Swiss-Prot record:
InterPro entries: Asxl_HARE-HTH, RNAP_delta_N_dom_sf, RpoE. The lineage of its organism: Bacteria, Bacillati, Bacillota, Bacilli, Lactobacillales. Participates in both the initiation and recycling phases of transcription. In the presence of the delta subunit, RNAP displays an increased specificity of transcription, a decreased affinity for nucleic acids, and an increased efficiency of RNA synthesis because of enhanced recycling. Residues 119-193 are annotated as: Disordered. This is Probable DNA-directed RNA polymerase subunit delta. The gene is rpoE. GO terms for molecular function: DNA-directed RNA polymerase activity. One of its GO terms (biological process) is regulation of DNA-templated transcription. Keywords: DNA-directed RNA polymerase, Nucleotidyltransferase, Transcription, Transferase.
Amino acid sequence: MALTQLGNHPKEELALVEIATAILSEHKTVMPFSSLVEEIQDFLAVDAETFQSRLSQFYTDLNTDGSFISLGNNEWGLRAWYPVDAIDESIHEIDDDDDAPKRKKAAKKVNVFADSAADDDVIDYNDDDPEDEDFGEVTEEETDVDVDDSEVEVEDDEEEEIAVGDDETIDDNLTELTGTNDLDDLSDGDIEK
């Protein structure tokens, strides 16, 4: 679709991605995003301030629309121009520059508490691992506890006194409850049959 074919439609009703597709088809080459935006502004005959409010949505549509492809350096083209294999190759060409592995030196650990490197009195805190400590092992010697039965005092008198007094009150409460139905108090007024 060329810009001349878009002239038949009202410009306000056209989507910006449709206009971008027509512009890229007419130029038949990739374009930087800024040039593409300028071409769209010229076609719509709007100034930059008016177009600014639609710019972020246009960029989002450009990324999500399947008919466009970003070729790096903010250059855009039509996906139809590139077969799938060529797309992979062009992406890998950009990545080839970054293939040289960059190795970083491991940071040497320094003990800030040491006066000198040869100081033997310094505690090495790197060897302390709280997960290595064994708190769960218990020997038989630790579990054997000698208890003398004569030292343990049990007071049976109090339990007997409580038991006698409680039997009478429990029986009284049971006789009071047997005649009532607690669910009747919560009913909505319907009579049970």
